């Protein structure tokens, strides 16, 4: 936990320093991709403590030799839907970018992920959830951990799942094959929405008649799950139970931001609750590598996910 707090800037700090800014503008999805408002205009949702207008800031720091983009100060969350390519399997994945609940690594851990999964016949949706301070986070102003008064990120995640299911016919989705995939803070969000059957907001329209829990969950290099001392209990999460969906966890042992015990403690809780779970740990790989392939074996994780989705019956049997 101490290491997580001290090195959180590996992902979030770059977005907060002028030296890292190449250009800034409001983020838009790739051409041809539909971006929809997550909430009706009349919905009374909490507003994060923003520093200004929403902006997408290209970072000078490189991942696999390429820059990445951080979205800051999101007040109006959206869902960008990438249609399945080829034979539609009916599977849908909602992607939660990481960024310490302060910014969103929108391409590295968002749009690029959808580009990788849609060729498998999977509909993919990137959630641009509210930040900053929408989940438990490290606040530089007080040099302390803070929890939001309203679980804004969790509310956005639940709403995104309900919204996808409500429009399943339109997007060719099987409402019983809707999963989540999150990185870092987004990994915590994947775990949180997987263990919270109760809606954390007042329903706003007919879409909220749908279930809020996903049918499967992918948790990559998560944070905020371990108290730094005990492996017997998960922190910042509703109780893990047999109702938690099948889960895939992946992390590197040399992760400098979130200790590998973040994954281990969650794995042990799932194991105890008899939830089908796969845990993949690698000696090397670091943090925030997204879906960008390098010489590190861990970056070839998408092939493991594809095999796992076949194994749990989400994707049809492999030929």
Describe each PLM feature range.
Residues 25-87:
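N-terminal cap/lid segment of alpha/beta-hydrolase-fold proteins
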Residues 107-125:
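Short amphipathic alpha-helix adjacent to the substrate-entry channel of hydrolases
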Residues 152-242:
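Primarily recognizes the serine-hydrolase "nucleophile elbow" in alpha/beta-hydrolase
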Residues 249-251, 255:
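Short beta-strand/loop motif that positions the catalytic acidic residue
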Residues 256-262:
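Conserved alpha/beta-hydrolase "acid-adjacent" motif
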Residues 264-319:
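C-terminal catalytic histidine-bearing segment of alpha/beta-hydrolase fold enzymes
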């Amino acid at each position: 936990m101490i290491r997580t707090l001290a090195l959180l800037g590996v992902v979030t700090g770059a977005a907060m320093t002028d030296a890292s800014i190449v250009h800034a503008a409001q983020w838009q999805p790739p051409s041809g991709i539909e971006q929809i408002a997550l909430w009706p205009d009349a919905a009374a949702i909490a507003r994060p403590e923003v520093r200004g207008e929403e902006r997408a800031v290209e970072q000078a720091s490189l991942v696999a030799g390429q820059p990445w983009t951080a979205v800051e100060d999101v007040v109006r969350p959206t869902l960008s839907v990438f249609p399945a390519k080829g034979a539609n399997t009916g599977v849908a994945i909602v992607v939660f970018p990481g960024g310490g609940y302060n910014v969103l690594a929108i391409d590295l851990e968002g749009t690029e992920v959808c580009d990788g999964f849609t060729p498998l016949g999977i509909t993919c949706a990137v959630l641009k959830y509210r930040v900053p301070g929408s989940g438990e986070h490290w606040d530089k102003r007080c040099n302390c951990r803070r929890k939001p008064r309203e679980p804004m990120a969790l509310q956005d995640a639940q709403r995104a799942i309900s919204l996808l299911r409500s429009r399943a016919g339109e997007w060719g989705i099987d409402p019983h094959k809707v999963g989540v995939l999150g990185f870092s803070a987004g990994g915590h969000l994947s775990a949180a929405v997987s263990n919270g059957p109760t809606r954390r907001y007042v329903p706003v329209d007919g879409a909220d008649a749908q279930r809020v829990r996903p049918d499967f969950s992918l948790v990559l290099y998560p944070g905020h799950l371990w108290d730094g001392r005990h492996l017997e209990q998960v922190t910042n999460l509703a109780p893990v139970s047999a109702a938690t969906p099948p889960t895939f966890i992946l992390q590197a042992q040399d992760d400098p931001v979130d200790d590998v015990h973040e994954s281990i403690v969650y794995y042990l809780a799932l194991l105890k609750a008899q939830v089908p779970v796969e845990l993949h740990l690698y000696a090397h790989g670091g943090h925030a590598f997204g879906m960008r392939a390098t010489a590190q074996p861990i970056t070839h994780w998408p092939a493991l996910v594809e095999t796992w989705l076949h194994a749990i019956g989400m994707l049809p049997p492999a030929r």
